[in-house]
């Protein structure tokens, strides 16, 4: 596999900027314009070749506009744009011409490798809509597995569609995901507000083998991990989440003290979670301010998890620890989460930003 990536670097101040929304967004990262490659840095491994272009002349910027770049039809070449939502980063692929992903799960895992690939938490495919939706979204995690959906990924997806369609200002889309219908709305300030639907609390639908102790829901139940009892609440946002505020009978968590790589996999692969689970470790700062670290199923420790932030607010409300509208601090930054009582829907608001675009020879 060979990868060519355009990096975000400064150019001379007299250079003319590209006028579309994509370049303006990248301009917030650095003074980037696209054009001729003056330098090329290459790295080779037995399985792929990575090259990054730097210091470019903007005179021919139009040749590297998002539309023209992603519309290229080259056999054996995958064009992509990398985005991130609070550091949760994804490779976005324009797959609107096919209902099958353009790469395999094995190829996606190679692309996501942070040492020998592009580096990402997952690959997201923008696909034709189904069942009357505008678009469909599929994701391959960095380990090649396929989750039902991803909250931060949905925000990146929405911004990606806006760039592809050259949409300006406020817009909303209907997206079919493995977790059902999701409706993101790009705000005037560029933030993305997403209607994440309703939480699933029935134990067998999360799924978890833990017995429901609050009706059919699992709330503050005991989960024994390596001989230690934790209080957990189980919530599905279309994908499974196990939320804990601390050990049974112990003080509230201080999440910065956790050895996440050690404890995270033990929750993910616990026998009580037949489909594995995402795990949120939560510290309560106030009734409207929560702090979390996450171990994601199939991706490990990440800087942010949108569905996890939604799930933990549900858990915090069910356990009486927080109100329905909260700021959730993640390692990559804050998300605004609201679980509305009127319709039982959860709304997530946060950023999504383009990083760079590139190509991979498959």
From Swiss-Prot:
Active site: 150, 305
Pathway: Amino-acid biosynthesis; L-lysine biosynthesis via DAP pathway; DL-2,6-diaminopimelate from LL-2,6-diaminopimelate: step 1/1
Catalytic reaction list: (2S,6S)-2,6-diaminopimelate = meso-2,6-diaminopimelate
EC number: 5.1.1.7
InterPro entries: DAP_epimerase_AS (IPR018510), DAP_epimerase_DapF (IPR001653)
One Pfam family, short name: DAP_epimerase
Activity regulation behaviour: Inhibited by aziridino-diaminopimelate (AziDAP).
PANTHER family named in the record: DIAMINOPIMELATE EPIMERASE, DIAMINOPIMELATE EPIMERASE, CHLOROPLASTIC
Additional notes on this entry: This enzyme requires no cofactors.
Primary role: Racemase that operates by a 'two-base' mechanism, which involves one active-site cysteine acting as a base to abstract the alpha-proton of an amino acid, while a second cysteine thiol functions as an acid to reprotonate the resulting planar carbanionic intermediate from the opposite face.
Protein name, as recorded: Diaminopimelate epimerase, chloroplastic
Organism: Arabidopsis thaliana
Lineage of producing organism: Eukaryota, Viridiplantae, Streptophyta, Embryophyta, Tracheophyta
Gene encoding the protein: DAPF
